[in-house]
Amino acid sequence: MTLIAFELSGETPEIPTAEIVGVLESENIPFSFKCQLEQVFIIETPGIDAGLTDILASRLAMTRHIIEVSGVSPANLTDIISMAEKVDFSNLNSLTYIVRAKKIKRKSHISSEDIERGIGKVLYDRGYRADLVNPCIQYRAIVSDNTCIFGPVIASIDSSAFERRKPHNKPFFYPGVLMPKLAQALVNIARVKEGSVVLDPYCGTGGIMVEAGLIGASTLGCDVQRKVLIGAKINLDFYSVNYSLMFQDAGSMALRNNCVDCIVTDPPYGRSALIQARSLDTLMQDSLCEMYRVLRPKGRLVLVSERPVETWAQNAGFRMADLFTQRVHRSLTRRITVLDK
């Protein structure tokens, strides 16, 4: 069995781990939870090959690095060096290396530089060659909650693509939409994978559909505002994803029963929006019943709201799977409700 550590980005305490679990489950990667430290999530698995590593690296939005754990020690320099001396580095052979250390929220009294020098000396004394510019392997030591997790980095996540897909960088911009990093995380929590059919019944400018489509899902979107539907088409065409758009009310969708695998949506609840002569509460009740109807058995709905929706969801037939909160600013805290059929 292999220990795998995920170094998390730290935007929220719970969403990053939930998206990791969602991707592992969607890709049928066997694993068991080992432990969690601040901004570090550790699992045990029979092994992750290069193909699965590439999938994880391309999917995860709120992870920075994935590490194959070689050693664990208390977070003091003596124990860290002692741990490194027991690590088998024979897989390096003639490859070059670099050692990098990260202190989570800088709570430890030892410096990252001392950790890097201490572990680097262990490798140097064994005859291995460092390369600070273009190393073949990066070893990473993460210090969190008085514990040091050490091992080679098997994948790093490039977040620059999410920056490039921010709403103001897309061909069609409309305010008040989710950032792509969060949208991708919610898609992962919904257990979307390549080939899934994903519905966003309040699709707006198509931000969630873009993230699901880039995974390889077939996406469906509904909205009652023609302007934003046209904008969604512009954005979806720009990213060349597989999509269908429908001008229709989320409370009465022209879709057959049990026809979608996953639903990920950010309804206009509590915000100014064009709603066809009904209250937002009534719309939410009706749309949750419709989402339950069109979702396949064992499918998952991930819904963003500003008020509790649990009662309406349970009345529609859903089972609560999880609930997360994300503070946006002083007057807005998002509720992310995960519901299973």
Predicted regions and their residues:
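N-terminal, Lys/Arg- and Ser/Thr-rich interaction peptides
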Residues: 87-92
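Long recognition/docking surfaces used for binding and targeting
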Residues: 93-104, 108-131
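Class I S-adenosyl-L-methionine-dependent methyltransferase catalytic core
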Residues: 1-62, 77-86, 104-115, 125, ...
